[in-house]
Design a protein with these regions (language model features):
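ABC transporter nucleotide-binding domains
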Residues: 2-4, 9-202, 206-208
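Hydrophobic/anchoring residues in structured secondary elements
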Residues: 9, 34, 249-255, 296
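Conserved protein kinase catalytic domain
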Residues: 73, 114, 169, 216, ...
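Positions that flank functional sites
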Residues: 114, 129, 256-257, 299
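ABC transporter nucleotide-binding domain
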Residues: 170-183, 187-269
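C-terminal coupling/interaction segments
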Residues: 269-318
Length: 318
């Protein structure tokens, strides 16, 4: 179990993390989210013992990581985004070396982790020859070598192809049945797929901590409509959309070129569950907008993340 209690971290006069508190029990996979510069990485580094809090306390299974760092760190496995592996070593030799460093029996632990992390096909290869997906598997085996109770993963599927992503996620799900797991990622769909709970940090503060469905219900909208229109003056488009009854928020999602067309994607959220598509479509046609697509969007963690990490929301939480 991890208990983070009123933790802050200063870098000179700058407060990167400000009075953050949460706890994570065994057997839970939690997503740690936040925009760049929000304090997410600093929080992870304090939990893993790489940084000491300026204020507050972090307990690892009841042990203060600041006063008993060695004992606490024995319970933590950490997989950084770009793990420093020895490329010239054969996978099997590398894992035996890591086992010996942890005082584990290589004859027992290496075959066990080879099976758990799906490394059978690459055990005789040099690490430098491995795909990114297999390097991630080796990094995960490294993090699990001393059988930690807590596993912290930083961007575990970043840069992987879809098949590799699903393979790594399956491993993490299995690991999470018996361990506390924190997944830090910018891929919001990954948190929805892997995690039952999300902790969101913005502006150095905790802005949300709840299970994902509750977050969607509390901070999302019951109904959203996504529009794909020809590129146009967004400010005028937004004003026109807001004339439609029951529209709550309007947000430009992207501007791209698709099949030779320059298009803009706009997400329109609705108060309640009122059907606005007929009126919205009529307005767009009458105003001579080029409407290519209109579809209903389910609430997503991306909508929640956007709502909680905008400057206005963050300031309101201070």
């Amino acid at each position: 179990m991890i208990e983070v209690s009123h933790v802050s971290r200063n870098f000179g006069a700058f407060r990167a993390v400000n009075d953050v508190s949460f706890s994570i029990p065994t057997g839970q996979i939690v997503g740690l989210l936040g925009p760049n510069g929000a304090g997410k990485t600093t929080t992870m580094r304090m939990i893993t013992g790489f940084l000491e809090p300026s204020e507050g306390q972090i307990l690892i299974d009841g042990t203060d990581i600041s006063t008993a760092p060695v004992e606490s760190k024995r319970k933590i496995g950490y997989m950084p985004e770009s793990a420093p592996l020895y490329g010239e070593m054969i996978v099997e030799d590398y894992l035996k070396y890591i086992a010996q460093m942890h005082g584990e029996d290589p004859a027992v632990k290496v075959p066990e982790l080879c099976k758990e992390c799906g490394l059978k096909e690459v055990m005789s290869k040099n690490i430098s020859e491995l795909s990114r997906g297999n390097r991630q598997r080796v990094s995960l085996a490294h993090a699990l070598m001393h059988d930690p109770e807590i596993l912290i993963l930083d961007e575990p599927t970043s840069g992987l192809d879809p098949n590799q992503v699903e393979d790594v996620r399956a491993i993490i799900r299995e690991i999470g049945k018996t361990r506390t797991v924190i997944v830090s990622t910018h891929i919001l769909s990954e948190v929805e797929t892997l995690c039952s709970r999300a902790i969101i940090i913005a502006g150095g503060k905790l802005v949300a901590d709840s299970n994902i469905e509750d977050l969607k219900e509390k901070f999302g909208h019951e109904l959203s409509v996504k529009l794909t229109v020809g590129k146009t003056d967004y400010e005028q488009l937004e004003k026109d959309i807001r004339t439609v009854n029951a529209v709550d928020t309007v947000r430009k999602v992207s501007e791209t070129d698709q099949d030779g067309l320059s298009v803009m994607e706009v997400l329109v959220s609705v108060n309640g569950i009122q059907e606005i598509r007929p009126e919205l479509c009529k307005m767009l046609v009458e105003k001579n907008y080029a409407l290519y697509e209109m579809c209903i969007e389910r609430n997503s963690l991306e909508d929640v993340f956007h709502a909680l990490t905008t400057n206005e929301t963050t300031e309101a939480k201070k």
